Regions:
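Glycine/proline-enriched, intrinsically flexible loops and inter-domain linkers
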Residues: 210-302
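Acidic, Ser/Thr/Pro
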Residues: 1-219
Length: 302
């Protein structure tokens, strides 16, 4: 079976191979990074995280879908401005730093025994029972169904108020990287579902790496020029060092981070500047040439 585990970005602090149909739990410190990889592609994974300091006080506050979707205005946060997952206390727990798939699920529970029983598969192993088993040692109460981030699930809103699910778009070696915004207690599954298309009808392993915060990951989506092309991560342009000081609102434009607007200016002022003053626009996504060198200013003023 074809499988890819991409090389570490730098030395990981921990590596966990989550065998198919099982789960594992682990803890990370604030600022650390969590990389969840689908080595064979099309294998889905449920991710849960709790604020460790609150758990130590007997309070369970995990990632919450509704709070996240409300604050982010997106069905699933992604790298950039709208990147955070929140708990019910409105505190951010993780930030999405890199995402090479971009399609995940924040509507459904991690799979449950009831899901399989309703389909006629009594006693089928499921993610919720697996999470109950591995999270219990950290004092997290058992649940019939877990509110998880369902990574790599191809879920969307359909017509007539339906929620649709199909085979994952993830390819071998695809991954998501989170940055912990608190000390976190986490759980990750390798989904065991073999009765529908979510895992390509064939459950496989999930691989997790954690990295300490000594280095910083660049924020990136994956961009493919064609369906069979190798993925390329979003890049900063030659102007990013300056524009990043003027705004946090960047969008992915054909593989480059471009400013969407500038803080404290607004659409009207920007429009007026285009008509009445001079503006510099970053057109790197159009593959324009960058002008560099000691005489660059003279050339631009020519």
């Amino acid at each position: 079976e074809f499988s890819i585990i991409p090389d570490p970005v730098y030395d990981p602090s921990n590596e966990i191979n989550i065998v198919k149909t099982t789960a594992n739990s682990y803890q990370v410190k604030e600022g650390d990074y969590i990389q969840v990889i689908t080595p064979t592609g099309r294998q889905c994974s449920d991710f849960v995280a709790y604020d460790t300091s609150k758990l130590d006080k007997g309070k369970e506050n995990g990632l919450d879908w509704q709070t996240t979707r409300t604050f982010m205005g997106h069905t699933f946060p992604g790298p950039g401005l709208f990147s955070k997952f929140y708990d019910v206390d409105h505190e951010p727990l993780v930030e999405v730093v890199r995402d090479t798939v971009g399609i995940h699920d924040t509507f459904n529970l991690a799979c449950t025994s009831k899901y399989y029983e309703d389909a006629g598969y009594f006693g089928h192993i499921n993610c919720s029972d697996n999470l109950n088993e591995v999270m219990e040692k950290y004092g997290v109460q058992k649940k019939k169904g877990w509110h998880a981030i369902n990574l790599f699930f191809n879920t969307s809103a359909g017509g007539q108020n339906s929620v649709l699910s199909d085979e994952s778009y993830a390819r071998p070696g695809d991954y998501v990287i989170f940055r912990a915004l608190k000390d976190l207690t986490c759980g990750t599954t390798a989904c065991p579902s073999d009765i529908d298309s979510c895992n390509g009808w064939n459950p496989t392993d999930i691989f997790v790496r954690t990295y300490d915060k000594k280095k910083e990951f660049t924020k990136s989506f994956a961009f493919r020029m064609k369906t069979d092309s190798e993925k390329k991560l979003t890049r900063n342009t030659g102007f990013y060092e300056r524009t990043s000081k003027l705004t946090r609102n960047f969008i992915d434009a054909r593989g480059f981070w471009l400013p969407n607007d500038y803080t404290k200016h607004g659409v009207i002022n920007e429009y007026t500047a285009c008509r009445e003053k001079a503006v510099v626009i970053d057109l790197s996504s159009l593959r324009k040439f960058e002008i560099i060198g000691p005489d660059a200013e003279e050339l631009m003023n020519y």
